Amino acid sequence: MIRVATSADDAFILGLVERFSEFPLPPGRDRQSVTAALRRDLELHLHERPITSHFFVIVQDGERAGFMHLQLVDDFFDAGLLCHISDLAVSPAHEGHGLGQRLLVHSEAFAREHGCVRLTLGVFPGNERARRLYARYGFEPDMLRLGKPL
C-alpha cells in the first residue's frame, strides 16, 4: 500500500537518508557531506510541507518499507509542469521485493493526475542499481550535470 506521509512518518523518512550514499560517489563528494545535505533538505521540506512537495510512504506487511518525495515544478525549457522525484528510498530489509518499482509507477500516475508533461529525477552515476531500475521504466538522460572538484 502506498499512502500520503504524515508528520508521524518523519523519523522513518529521515532514518533512510544513509541509503542515498551507499554506493561509489563522484570525485569530490563524501558520504558525510552528501548525507548531511540531503538530511537538511528533507528536514526543511518535512517541516515546512510546501504545497509543491508531496511525500508518500510504502507499507508492506503493516510496516513502513520506503518513501518517495515528489516536487511539482515548472519545466525550465517548455514552461509545462513537471514532477521531480526528489528522493526515493526503500529500507534494506525490504529491498528486492519490487517496492521501488511500485513507487515509480505511483509517481507516474501522480504526475499524470497533476497534468505534468515530464517526470524527472537525479541519480548519482555510482548508483547503478537505481540507474538500471530507472532505465527499465523509461528514464533516459535529459540533461547531464557535469562537475569538477576544485
Regions found by a protein language model. Give the residues of each.
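A short beta-loop-alpha structural element at the N-terminal edge
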Residues: 1-15, 26
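Conserved GNAT-fold acetyl-CoA-binding loop/helix
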Residues: 21-44
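A short helix-loop-beta-strand connector motif used in the catalytic cores of GNAT acetyltransferases and
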Residues: 43-57, 84
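Conserved beta-strand in the GNAT
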Residues: 57, 63-72, 84, 89
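Conserved beta-strand-loop-alpha-helix junction that forms the acyl-donor binding cleft
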Residues: 95, 117-130, 147-150
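Conserved GNAT acetyl-CoA-binding A-motif
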Residues: 104, 111-122
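Conserved active-site alpha-helix within GNAT-family acetyltransferase domains
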Residues: 101, 113, 125-143
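Conserved acetyl-CoA-binding loop-helix of GNAT-fold acetyltransferases
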Residues: 87-90, 96-109, 132, 136
